[in-house]
């Protein structure tokens, strides 16, 4: 078994140590005898989403998001097809905002990928601090650190979790993140996956299930039932 992880634009979207999330995925695959490789894509690179099993879209400043905005338009069609075919995506902070239709800032409008029906607008002040949420995906809470000026509205989409302590998407709704098909978006840093290995295992399991179809669907279910998130 093999998983290929695509890290989109880590030279620009790596504000909060997203390489730690890549390292976590690689290590947890290694521990389970799953071959894994990471491909880091820069702005000038062509991305073949059909060869990727997990895509990481990390966080960046508003300036850096503006820099990648034009490139995102070029990959939008292929990225959308990947998502609709149940491709696995983890998007964090700025990357989370870019999943939606737009991010409206004081400096202008950043057009998003339109992969998920959601949008973000800059609010007054930043939402900063430790955060704890409860997700329907796991028995144990998800924890991390948030630091964002954007207020995200996810419409009719399902949130990643309900905030137990902290701010979440907008500081008011009590929701944090978004889940759409096999896409997970969140404001949580930490890095996210080392702090929440159960989430890393979910991404790996879903990637295996999709790649190997019926055979690995059975294996993935067995893996989820026996994997300890802290092993």
Annotated model-derived regions:
Residues 1-84, 194-224:
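N-terminal beta1-alpha1 cap of cysteine-dependent amidohydrolase-like domains
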Residues 2, 122-224:
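Amide-donor transfer/coupling interface in amidating biosynthetic enzymes
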Residues 54-58, 90, 185-187:
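Structural motif
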Residues 62-135, 139:
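Cysteine-nucleophile active-site neighborhood
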Residues 220, 230-231:
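Short helix-coil boundary/hinge micro-motifs
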